[in-house]
Amino acid sequence: VQRVDPISIATSVATPAATSISAPAAATTTPPPFTVTSVFTEARLDSWVTVGLVLVAGLYLYGVHRLRVSGTRWPVVRTALFLGPGLGGIASVTVSGLQTYDSTLLSVHMVQHMMLSMVAPIFLALGAPITLALQALPPRPRERLLAMVHSRLARAYSYPLVAFAIFVVTPFAIYFTDLYRYTLEHAWAHGLVHAHLILTGCVFFWPLLGVDPLPGRWPHPGRALLMLLSVPLYTVLGLSIMQSSTLFGGDWHPSLGLTWADPWEDQVIAGGILWGGGEFVSVTVLAVLVGQWMRQAEREARRIDRELDRQEAHQRATGATG
């Protein structure tokens, strides 16, 4: 008769249970292989994000309608930028099938990060929603909005150096602490991070682009310098992720047991997305700011020339009458 060790039996029974408990809950609902088609087939329109985006779009269009009724023309380009790559950009990564894979593939999460913190906020700023609201609102709500925009909290949070510090610290705080793993395990935290990325991007880019009348805006040289300082951010961040010897999120992604994705390869792709995408957006915005600076300098030069011409003409007229 073979002797059976009760301790070994207990260990063999307990081990799978412990493994199943520590494995991510998402493993029971692993999505199908990621393809272009799945971006559409895995979309979810029945979410609070969809409701929020539709509500914001409706308010914007209502403001445009009020201006049109009052005889004021609102640029169609601004409306297209706000609704298209602005709100549409947010929807493309939070409502489409990408949201199904944001806790499965780090690379998809990085696409979300880029869109929510850098791309969409730029086009939201170009849509000038605050300017639209100030023109469309009745006097009393307009005064309240101005009070909010110029409040101490708004001034402090949107001050360029403060906004720059938050913009720089945010990605490192997410990916180089336990926060990223926590967002993978808790959907509500994941949603809060998305909201924070949008807000941080708006606070950073809106004063730089200078479309809306926000407090604390710097002159063009200061804006260009601040944008220049942000260019290396995503290079350092992307390379750090690509060259990391540990997986971000710990054992979360390996424990999903995906047969169609390798966590290590996906992490390299994720770092490349941050590196390349961040560099492209930063350099593009820097070029736009330099262009604004040059046009502003040209306008100032023409103004000075006109003033000098008026003074010279006045002196000649005075000399002739004398």
Named regions from a protein language model:
Residues 2-322:
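Alpha-helical membrane segments of multi-pass proteins
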